[in-house]
Amino acid sequence: MKIHEECGVFGVMTKEPANVAMMCYYGLYALQHRGQESCGIVVNEDGLFHSHKDLGLVNEVFTGDVLSRLPRGSIAVAHTRYGTTGATNRRNCQPIEVNHQKGHMAIAHNGNLSNAAALRSELELSGAIFHTTSDTETIAYIITRERLRAPSIEEAVSRAMNTLDGAYSLVIMSPQKLICARDPYGFRPLCYGQTEDGSYVVASESCALAAVGAKFIRDVEPGEILVLTSEGLCSRKEHCESRERRLCIFEYIYFARPDSVIDGISVHAARQRAGADLAKTHPVCVDVVVGVPDSGLDAAIGYSQASGIPYGIGLIKNKYIGRTFIAPDARADQVRIKLSPIRETVEGKRVVLIDDSIVRGTTCGRIVRLLREAGAKEIHMRVTAPPFLYPCYYGTDIDSQENLIACHHSIPEICQMIGADSLGYLPVGHLHCLTGHSHYCSACFCGSYPTAIPQGNSKSRFEQRLSERDGALTSFRGYD
Protein backbone atom coordinates (compact mmCIF):
# COMPACT_ATOMS: atom_id res chain seq x y z
CA MET A 1 0.00 0.00 0.00
CA LYS A 2 1.27 3.44 -0.95
CA ILE A 3 0.15 6.75 0.51
CA HIS A 4 -1.75 8.85 -1.99
CA GLU A 5 -1.83 12.60 -2.38
CA GLU A 6 -5.10 14.30 -3.15
CA CYS A 7 -4.59 16.08 -6.43
CA GLY A 8 -2.85 18.45 -8.77
CA VAL A 9 -4.05 21.87 -9.93
CA PHE A 10 -3.26 23.80 -13.08
CA GLY A 11 -4.32 27.13 -14.59
CA VAL A 12 -3.45 29.33 -17.55
CA MET A 13 -4.07 32.97 -18.51
CA THR A 14 -3.20 34.06 -22.07
CA LYS A 15 -3.10 37.53 -23.61
CA GLU A 16 -5.13 36.42 -26.63
CA PRO A 17 -7.58 33.53 -27.13
CA ALA A 18 -5.62 30.30 -27.55
CA ASN A 19 -5.95 26.54 -27.29
CA VAL A 20 -5.83 26.68 -23.51
CA ALA A 21 -7.52 23.27 -23.22
CA MET A 22 -4.50 21.65 -24.85
CA MET A 23 -2.17 23.51 -22.49
CA CYS A 24 -4.19 22.15 -19.57
CA TYR A 25 -4.06 18.68 -21.09
CA TYR A 26 -0.25 18.75 -21.17
CA GLY A 27 -0.17 20.24 -17.67
CA LEU A 28 -2.41 17.49 -16.28
CA TYR A 29 -0.24 14.85 -17.91
CA ALA A 30 2.73 16.22 -15.97
CA LEU A 31 0.65 16.12 -12.76
CA GLN A 32 -0.88 12.68 -13.31
CA HIS A 33 1.20 11.26 -10.45
CA ARG A 34 -0.75 13.47 -8.02
CA GLY A 35 -4.10 11.88 -8.83
CA GLN A 36 -5.37 9.04 -11.00
CA GLU A 37 -9.06 8.81 -10.11
CA SER A 38 -10.49 11.66 -12.17
CA CYS A 39 -9.60 14.84 -13.99
CA GLY A 40 -11.25 17.89 -15.52
CA ILE A 41 -10.73 21.07 -17.52
CA VAL A 42 -12.85 24.24 -17.59
CA VAL A 43 -12.25 26.75 -20.40
CA ASN A 44 -13.32 30.40 -20.26
CA GLU A 45 -14.57 31.62 -23.65
CA ASP A 46 -15.37 35.33 -23.29
CA GLY A 47 -16.94 34.75 -19.88
CA LEU A 48 -18.73 31.52 -20.82
CA PHE A 49 -17.45 28.38 -19.12
CA HIS A 50 -17.09 25.12 -21.05
CA SER A 51 -16.04 22.02 -19.14
CA HIS A 52 -15.36 18.34 -19.35
CA LYS A 53 -14.56 16.14 -16.36
CA ASP A 54 -14.86 12.46 -15.68
CA LEU A 55 -13.39 9.46 -13.90
CA GLY A 56 -10.19 8.11 -15.39
CA LEU A 57 -6.65 8.99 -16.34
CA VAL A 58 -5.90 12.10 -18.40
CA ASN A 59 -5.55 10.23 -21.69
CA GLU A 60 -8.77 8.28 -20.99
CA VAL A 61 -10.89 11.33 -20.19
CA PHE A 62 -9.45 13.75 -22.76
CA THR A 63 -9.52 12.03 -26.11
CA GLY A 64 -8.83 13.97 -29.28
CA ASP A 65 -12.57 14.30 -29.89
CA VAL A 66 -13.20 15.73 -26.42
CA LEU A 67 -10.35 18.23 -26.72
CA SER A 68 -11.57 19.37 -30.14
CA ARG A 69 -14.97 20.26 -28.65
CA LEU A 70 -13.50 22.55 -26.01
CA PRO A 71 -13.26 26.08 -27.48
CA ARG A 72 -10.33 28.43 -27.57
CA GLY A 73 -10.20 30.83 -24.66
CA SER A 74 -7.96 33.12 -22.65
CA ILE A 75 -8.35 31.46 -19.23
CA ALA A 76 -8.64 27.83 -18.12
CA VAL A 77 -8.32 25.76 -14.96
CA ALA A 78 -7.70 22.03 -14.63
CA HIS A 79 -7.48 19.36 -11.97
CA THR A 80 -6.42 15.76 -11.47
CA ARG A 81 -7.79 14.02 -8.40
CA TYR A 82 -7.11 11.30 -5.92
CA GLY A 83 -9.89 11.62 -3.38
CA THR A 84 -9.02 11.87 0.30
CA THR A 85 -12.46 13.17 1.23
CA GLY A 86 -15.47 12.32 -0.87
CA ALA A 87 -16.31 9.12 -2.66
CA THR A 88 -14.98 8.18 -6.07
CA ASN A 89 -17.79 9.26 -8.37
CA ARG A 90 -18.28 11.77 -11.14
CA ARG A 91 -20.02 14.25 -8.88
CA ASN A 92 -16.75 14.81 -6.99
CA CYS A 93 -14.72 15.49 -10.12
CA GLN A 94 -13.09 18.92 -10.23
CA PRO A 95 -12.87 21.78 -11.08
CA ILE A 96 -16.12 22.62 -9.28
CA GLU A 97 -18.28 25.32 -10.89
CA VAL A 98 -20.45 27.72 -8.92
CA ASN A 99 -23.03 30.28 -10.06
CA HIS A 100 -23.97 33.15 -7.76
CA GLN A 101 -25.65 36.56 -7.89
CA LYS A 102 -22.46 38.37 -8.86
CA GLY A 103 -21.32 35.91 -11.51
CA HIS A 104 -19.72 32.48 -11.55
CA MET A 105 -16.42 30.76 -10.88
CA ALA A 106 -14.60 27.45 -11.28
CA ILE A 107 -12.31 26.22 -8.52
CA ALA A 108 -9.63 23.51 -8.31
CA HIS A 109 -8.21 22.53 -4.93
CA ASN A 110 -5.27 20.53 -3.61
CA GLY A 111 -5.29 19.69 0.09
CA ASN A 112 -7.76 19.07 2.90
CA LEU A 113 -9.46 21.40 5.34
CA SER A 114 -9.00 20.36 8.95
CA ASN A 115 -12.24 22.19 9.87
CA ALA A 116 -14.27 20.93 6.89
CA ALA A 117 -16.90 19.11 8.97
CA ALA A 118 -17.60 22.15 11.18
CA LEU A 119 -17.78 24.52 8.21
CA ARG A 120 -20.08 22.21 6.29
CA SER A 121 -22.45 21.87 9.24
CA GLU A 122 -22.51 25.65 9.66
CA LEU A 123 -23.29 26.17 5.98
CA GLU A 124 -26.02 23.52 5.98
CA LEU A 125 -27.70 25.17 8.96
CA SER A 126 -27.78 28.41 6.98
CA GLY A 127 -29.49 26.69 4.06
CA ALA A 128 -26.63 25.53 1.83
CA ILE A 129 -27.32 22.44 -0.27
CA PHE A 130 -24.26 20.40 -1.19
CA HIS A 131 -23.99 18.42 -4.42
CA THR A 132 -20.67 16.69 -3.63
CA THR A 133 -18.97 15.02 -0.69
CA SER A 134 -15.70 16.89 -1.28
CA ASP A 135 -14.44 19.63 1.01
CA THR A 136 -13.65 21.65 -2.12
CA GLU A 137 -17.34 22.49 -2.37
CA THR A 138 -17.17 23.81 1.20
CA ILE A 139 -14.37 26.17 0.12
CA ALA A 140 -16.45 27.23 -2.89
CA TYR A 141 -19.43 28.03 -0.64
CA ILE A 142 -17.30 30.07 1.77
CA ILE A 143 -15.79 32.10 -1.09
CA THR A 144 -19.23 32.59 -2.67
CA ARG A 145 -20.67 33.81 0.63
CA GLU A 146 -17.89 36.36 0.94
CA ARG A 147 -18.16 37.35 -2.73
CA LEU A 148 -21.73 38.53 -2.21
CA ARG A 149 -20.38 41.11 0.25
CA ALA A 150 -16.95 41.81 -1.21
CA PRO A 151 -16.06 44.24 -4.04
CA SER A 152 -13.98 41.65 -5.93
CA ILE A 153 -13.33 37.93 -6.17
CA GLU A 154 -9.80 38.32 -4.80
CA GLU A 155 -11.13 40.17 -1.75
CA ALA A 156 -13.65 37.36 -1.25
CA VAL A 157 -10.84 34.81 -1.35
CA SER A 158 -8.85 36.84 1.18
CA ARG A 159 -11.81 37.01 3.56
CA ALA A 160 -12.50 33.30 3.13
CA MET A 161 -8.94 32.52 4.15
CA ASN A 162 -9.75 33.91 7.60
CA THR A 163 -12.25 31.05 7.97
CA LEU A 164 -10.44 28.13 6.34
CA ASP A 165 -8.11 25.92 8.41
CA GLY A 166 -5.83 23.30 6.99
CA ALA A 167 -4.29 22.71 3.59
CA TYR A 168 -5.39 24.38 0.38
CA SER A 169 -3.65 25.37 -2.79
CA LEU A 170 -6.35 26.91 -4.97
CA VAL A 171 -6.69 27.90 -8.61
CA ILE A 172 -9.89 29.88 -9.22
CA MET A 173 -11.30 31.21 -12.49
CA SER A 174 -13.84 34.02 -12.77
CA PRO A 175 -15.08 35.50 -16.06
CA GLN A 176 -12.17 37.97 -16.15
CA LYS A 177 -9.52 36.69 -13.73
CA LEU A 178 -7.37 33.74 -12.76
CA ILE A 179 -6.64 33.65 -9.04
CA CYS A 180 -4.38 31.32 -7.11
CA ALA A 181 -4.01 31.12 -3.35
CA ARG A 182 -1.94 29.06 -0.94
CA ASP A 183 -2.81 28.51 2.72
CA PRO A 184 -0.70 30.44 5.26
CA TYR A 185 1.20 27.29 6.27
CA GLY A 186 2.00 26.35 2.67
CA PHE A 187 1.12 22.69 3.28
CA ARG A 188 0.80 21.95 -0.44
CA PRO A 189 3.01 23.31 -3.25
CA LEU A 190 1.98 25.93 -5.81
CA CYS A 191 4.08 27.84 -8.32
CA TYR A 192 3.76 29.92 -11.45
CA GLY A 193 5.69 30.74 -14.59
CA GLN A 194 5.39 32.44 -17.95
CA THR A 195 5.66 31.33 -21.57
CA GLU A 196 7.55 33.20 -24.29
CA ASP A 197 4.33 34.81 -25.55
CA GLY A 198 3.59 36.23 -22.08
CA SER A 199 0.97 33.70 -20.95
CA TYR A 200 0.92 32.96 -17.22
CA VAL A 201 0.78 29.37 -16.00
CA VAL A 202 0.02 28.20 -12.45
CA ALA A 203 0.61 24.62 -11.28
CA SER A 204 1.08 22.38 -8.27
CA GLU A 205 4.60 21.53 -9.42
CA SER A 206 7.23 23.14 -11.61
CA CYS A 207 7.39 20.02 -13.82
CA ALA A 208 3.96 21.01 -15.20
CA LEU A 209 5.28 24.46 -16.16
CA ALA A 210 8.06 22.83 -18.17
CA ALA A 211 5.51 20.58 -19.89
CA VAL A 212 3.90 23.62 -21.57
CA GLY A 213 7.12 25.51 -22.23
CA ALA A 214 6.69 27.98 -19.37
CA LYS A 215 9.68 29.36 -17.51
CA PHE A 216 9.46 28.96 -13.75
CA ILE A 217 9.23 32.34 -12.00
CA ARG A 218 8.74 31.42 -8.35
CA ASP A 219 6.64 29.55 -5.82
CA VAL A 220 3.46 31.14 -4.55
CA GLU A 221 4.28 32.11 -0.97
CA PRO A 222 2.32 30.60 1.92
CA GLY A 223 -0.64 32.91 2.51
CA GLU A 224 -0.21 34.70 -0.83
CA ILE A 225 -2.98 35.45 -3.32
CA LEU A 226 -2.01 36.01 -6.96
CA VAL A 227 -4.46 37.80 -9.25
CA LEU A 228 -3.89 37.37 -12.98
CA THR A 229 -5.75 39.48 -15.53
CA SER A 230 -5.27 40.53 -19.14
CA GLU A 231 -3.38 43.54 -17.76
CA GLY A 232 -0.86 41.53 -15.75
CA LEU A 233 -0.23 40.13 -12.29
CA CYS A 234 -0.99 41.47 -8.82
CA SER A 235 0.10 39.93 -5.52
CA ARG A 236 -1.71 40.20 -2.19
CA LYS A 237 0.24 39.20 0.91
CA GLU A 238 -1.95 40.16 3.86
CA HIS A 239 -1.96 36.52 5.01
CA CYS A 240 1.75 35.92 4.46
CA GLU A 241 3.93 35.25 7.51
CA SER A 242 0.84 34.90 9.71
CA ARG A 243 1.90 31.29 10.27
CA GLU A 244 5.19 29.40 10.24
CA ARG A 245 5.83 27.53 7.00
CA ARG A 246 4.78 23.89 7.14
CA LEU A 247 5.14 22.31 3.69
CA CYS A 248 4.37 18.58 3.84
CA ILE A 249 7.75 16.84 4.05
CA PHE A 250 6.31 13.87 2.17
CA GLU A 251 6.22 16.00 -0.97
CA TYR A 252 9.99 15.56 -1.08
CA ILE A 253 9.96 11.93 0.05
CA TYR A 254 7.32 10.61 -2.34
CA PHE A 255 4.51 12.80 -3.71
CA ALA A 256 6.32 15.18 -6.05
CA ARG A 257 8.02 14.32 -9.31
CA PRO A 258 11.83 14.24 -8.99
CA ASP A 259 12.27 16.90 -11.69
CA SER A 260 10.22 19.43 -9.70
CA VAL A 261 11.62 22.19 -7.52
CA ILE A 262 9.43 23.05 -4.52
CA ASP A 263 10.02 26.11 -2.38
CA GLY A 264 13.50 26.39 -3.86
CA ILE A 265 14.51 22.79 -3.16
CA SER A 266 15.11 20.13 -5.82
CA VAL A 267 13.04 17.02 -5.11
CA HIS A 268 15.68 14.84 -6.79
CA ALA A 269 18.46 16.28 -4.62
CA ALA A 270 16.35 16.01 -1.45
CA ARG A 271 15.81 12.30 -2.02
CA GLN A 272 19.49 11.73 -2.65
CA ARG A 273 20.30 13.48 0.63
CA ALA A 274 17.82 11.23 2.46
CA GLY A 275 19.53 8.17 1.00
CA ALA A 276 22.93 9.48 2.01
CA ASP A 277 21.69 10.07 5.56
CA LEU A 278 20.38 6.50 5.72
CA ALA A 279 23.81 5.22 4.72
CA LYS A 280 25.27 7.02 7.74
CA THR A 281 22.56 6.24 10.29
CA HIS A 282 21.89 2.66 9.18
CA PRO A 283 25.06 1.29 7.54
CA VAL A 284 25.19 -2.32 6.44
CA CYS A 285 27.77 -4.55 4.76
CA VAL A 286 26.23 -5.56 1.43
CA ASP A 287 27.15 -6.03 -2.23
CA VAL A 288 24.63 -3.83 -4.05
CA VAL A 289 22.15 -0.98 -3.45
CA VAL A 290 18.74 -1.37 -5.12
CA GLY A 291 15.94 1.22 -5.20
CA VAL A 292 12.21 0.53 -5.43
CA PRO A 293 10.83 2.40 -8.47
CA ASP A 294 10.16 5.21 -8.73
CA SER A 295 10.76 7.40 -5.68
CA GLY A 296 13.24 4.99 -4.12
CA LEU A 297 15.68 5.31 -7.03
CA ASP A 298 17.09 8.75 -6.21
CA ALA A 299 17.51 7.77 -2.56
CA ALA A 300 19.28 4.57 -3.58
CA ILE A 301 21.77 6.59 -5.62
CA GLY A 302 22.39 8.80 -2.58
CA TYR A 303 22.88 5.74 -0.38
CA SER A 304 25.33 4.28 -2.89
CA GLN A 305 27.35 7.47 -3.20
CA ALA A 306 27.61 7.95 0.57
CA SER A 307 28.44 4.32 1.35
CA GLY A 308 30.62 3.47 -1.62
CA ILE A 309 28.49 0.38 -2.29
CA PRO A 310 27.68 -0.10 -6.00
CA TYR A 311 24.21 0.91 -7.20
CA GLY A 312 22.36 -1.62 -9.31
CA ILE A 313 19.04 -1.68 -11.14
CA GLY A 314 17.40 -4.61 -9.41
CA LEU A 315 13.71 -3.93 -10.06
CA ILE A 316 11.97 -2.94 -13.28
CA LYS A 317 8.57 -1.25 -13.20
CA ASN A 318 5.95 -2.11 -15.79
CA LYS A 319 5.18 1.37 -17.11
CA TYR A 320 2.17 0.17 -19.09
CA ILE A 321 0.14 -1.41 -16.33
CA GLY A 322 -2.00 1.72 -15.90
CA ARG A 323 -5.20 0.86 -14.03
CA THR A 324 -5.18 -2.81 -15.01
CA PHE A 325 -8.02 -4.81 -13.51
CA ILE A 326 -6.85 -7.26 -10.87
CA ALA A 327 -9.34 -9.77 -9.50
CA PRO A 328 -9.98 -9.30 -5.75
CA ASP A 329 -8.71 -12.81 -5.01
CA ALA A 330 -5.48 -12.08 -6.91
CA ARG A 331 -4.45 -8.85 -5.18
CA ALA A 332 -1.35 -10.53 -3.79
CA ASP A 333 -0.10 -10.89 -7.36
CA GLN A 334 -0.28 -7.18 -8.20
CA VAL A 335 3.32 -6.55 -7.10
CA ARG A 336 4.47 -9.24 -9.53
CA ILE A 337 2.55 -7.52 -12.30
CA LYS A 338 3.98 -4.10 -11.50
CA LEU A 339 7.57 -5.03 -10.61
CA SER A 340 10.03 -7.56 -11.98
CA PRO A 341 13.44 -8.35 -10.42
CA ILE A 342 16.63 -8.47 -12.47
CA ARG A 343 18.23 -11.72 -11.39
CA GLU A 344 21.68 -10.76 -12.67
CA THR A 345 21.76 -7.83 -10.23
CA VAL A 346 20.68 -9.62 -7.05
CA GLU A 347 21.37 -13.35 -7.39
CA GLY A 348 23.77 -14.57 -4.73
CA LYS A 349 24.24 -11.05 -3.37
CA ARG A 350 23.56 -9.16 -0.19
CA VAL A 351 21.12 -6.37 -1.09
CA VAL A 352 20.19 -3.14 0.66
CA LEU A 353 16.73 -2.21 -0.62
CA ILE A 354 15.71 1.47 -0.51
CA ASP A 355 12.04 2.53 -0.47
CA ASP A 356 10.22 5.73 0.46
CA SER A 357 7.84 4.42 3.12
CA ILE A 358 6.15 1.50 4.82
CA VAL A 359 2.44 1.93 5.51
CA ARG A 360 0.82 -1.48 6.06
CA GLY A 361 3.88 -3.52 5.18
CA THR A 362 2.16 -5.74 2.63
CA THR A 363 3.75 -4.26 -0.51
CA CYS A 364 7.33 -4.16 0.76
CA GLY A 365 6.93 -7.69 2.08
CA ARG A 366 6.02 -8.89 -1.39
CA ILE A 367 8.95 -7.01 -2.92
CA VAL A 368 11.33 -8.65 -0.46
CA ARG A 369 9.85 -12.01 -1.44
CA LEU A 370 10.38 -11.24 -5.15
CA LEU A 371 14.06 -10.50 -4.58
CA ARG A 372 14.55 -13.65 -2.53
CA GLU A 373 12.95 -15.69 -5.31
CA ALA A 374 15.42 -14.02 -7.70
CA GLY A 375 18.29 -15.35 -5.61
CA ALA A 376 19.16 -12.51 -3.22
CA LYS A 377 21.19 -13.91 -0.31
CA GLU A 378 20.34 -11.12 2.17
CA ILE A 379 17.88 -8.22 1.96
CA HIS A 380 18.28 -5.21 4.25
CA MET A 381 15.40 -2.72 4.07
CA ARG A 382 16.08 1.02 4.41
CA VAL A 383 13.25 3.56 4.36
CA THR A 384 13.56 7.30 3.63
CA ALA A 385 10.58 8.17 5.85
CA PRO A 386 10.21 7.61 9.59
CA PRO A 387 7.49 5.19 10.77
CA PHE A 388 3.94 6.49 10.16
CA LEU A 389 2.24 6.80 13.54
CA TYR A 390 -0.53 9.40 13.16
CA PRO A 391 -3.34 10.38 10.75
CA CYS A 392 -2.88 13.21 8.25
CA TYR A 393 -5.52 15.93 7.95
CA TYR A 394 -3.83 17.97 5.24
CA GLY A 395 -4.29 16.14 1.96
CA THR A 396 -3.29 12.47 2.09
CA ASP A 397 -5.30 9.29 2.56
CA ILE A 398 -3.82 8.39 5.97
CA ASP A 399 -7.12 8.86 7.78
CA SER A 400 -6.57 6.72 10.88
CA GLN A 401 -4.01 4.68 12.77
CA GLU A 402 -5.85 1.44 12.07
CA ASN A 403 -3.86 0.48 8.95
CA LEU A 404 -0.49 1.87 10.05
CA ILE A 405 1.75 -1.10 10.81
CA ALA A 406 4.12 0.98 12.97
CA CYS A 407 1.26 1.78 15.36
CA HIS A 408 0.86 -1.86 16.26
CA HIS A 409 4.32 -3.39 15.89
CA SER A 410 7.91 -2.61 16.85
CA ILE A 411 10.62 -2.17 14.22
CA PRO A 412 12.05 -5.67 14.87
CA GLU A 413 8.54 -7.10 14.52
CA ILE A 414 7.97 -5.24 11.25
CA CYS A 415 11.31 -6.48 9.97
CA GLN A 416 10.26 -10.04 10.67
CA MET A 417 6.81 -9.51 9.13
CA ILE A 418 8.19 -8.22 5.82
CA GLY A 419 10.85 -10.93 5.70
CA ALA A 420 13.90 -8.65 5.69
CA ASP A 421 17.24 -9.35 7.36
CA SER A 422 17.32 -5.86 8.89
CA LEU A 423 15.22 -2.71 8.79
CA GLY A 424 16.15 0.93 9.26
CA TYR A 425 14.05 4.09 9.00
CA LEU A 426 15.17 7.68 8.54
CA PRO A 427 14.99 9.15 12.07
CA VAL A 428 12.39 11.87 12.63
CA GLY A 429 15.15 14.17 13.83
CA HIS A 430 16.95 13.77 10.50
CA LEU A 431 14.09 14.89 8.24
CA HIS A 432 15.77 18.26 7.90
CA CYS A 433 18.39 16.56 5.73
CA LEU A 434 15.88 16.69 2.88
CA THR A 435 15.29 20.44 3.06
CA GLY A 436 18.15 21.96 5.01
CA HIS A 437 15.68 23.51 7.46
CA SER A 438 12.95 22.48 9.91
CA HIS A 439 10.03 24.44 8.44
CA TYR A 440 7.94 21.48 7.33
CA CYS A 441 4.96 19.43 8.51
CA SER A 442 5.82 16.01 9.92
CA ALA A 443 2.63 15.47 11.93
CA CYS A 444 2.07 11.97 10.50
CA PHE A 445 5.40 10.94 12.06
CA CYS A 446 5.39 12.83 15.36
CA GLY A 447 1.75 13.81 16.04
CA SER A 448 2.46 17.55 16.33
CA TYR A 449 -0.25 19.20 14.22
CA PRO A 450 0.16 22.81 13.07
CA THR A 451 -3.62 23.43 13.20
CA ALA A 452 -6.27 22.56 15.74
CA ILE A 453 -7.77 19.11 15.25
CA PRO A 454 -11.19 18.72 16.94
CA GLN A 455 -11.34 15.98 19.56
CA GLY A 456 -12.62 12.76 18.09
CA ASN A 457 -12.35 14.15 14.57
CA SER A 458 -11.20 11.82 11.84
CA LYS A 459 -11.52 11.96 8.11
CA SER A 460 -13.00 8.48 8.09
CA ARG A 461 -15.91 9.60 10.29
CA PHE A 462 -16.39 12.70 8.15
CA GLU A 463 -16.28 10.52 5.04
CA GLN A 464 -18.80 8.08 6.50
CA ARG A 465 -21.23 10.85 7.38
CA LEU A 466 -20.96 12.41 3.94
CA SER A 467 -21.26 9.05 2.19
CA GLU A 468 -24.42 8.22 4.10
CA ARG A 469 -25.85 11.55 3.05
CA ASP A 470 -24.54 11.03 -0.46
CA GLY A 471 -26.89 8.08 -0.89
CA ALA A 472 -29.84 10.40 -0.45
CA LEU A 473 -28.66 12.99 -2.96
CA THR A 474 -30.36 13.21 -6.32
CA SER A 475 -28.40 12.44 -9.47
CA PHE A 476 -26.12 15.17 -10.70
CA ARG A 477 -25.84 15.95 -14.40
CA GLY A 478 -22.70 18.09 -14.31
CA TYR A 479 -21.76 20.94 -16.59
CA ASP A 480 -20.48 19.24 -19.74
Q: What do these predicted ranges mean?
A:
Residues M1-P222, V227-V286, V292, E378:
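Conserved short alpha-helical segments that host acidic/polar catalytic motifs at enzyme active sites
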Residues T84-T85, N115, I179, F187-R188, ...:
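Flexible loop/turn segments at secondary-structure boundaries
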Residues A128, R149-A150, P283-D287, Q305-G312, ...:
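Secondary-structure transition/capping motifs at alpha-helix termini
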Residues T132, E137-Y141, Y311-G322, M417-T435:
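A conserved beta-strand->alpha-helix junction
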Residues Y141-P151, P293, I301, Q305-R323:
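Amphipathic alpha-helical
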Residues M161, Q176, G213-D219, C240, ...:
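PRPP-dependent phosphoribosyltransferase catalytic core
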Residues V289, G296-Y303, S307, Y311, ...:
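Extended, hydrophobic alpha-helical segments in both membrane/secreted and soluble proteins
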Residues G308-V352, G361-T362, Y390-D399:
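Short, glycine/charge-rich flexible loops or terminal/linker lids adjacent to PRPP-binding catalytic cores
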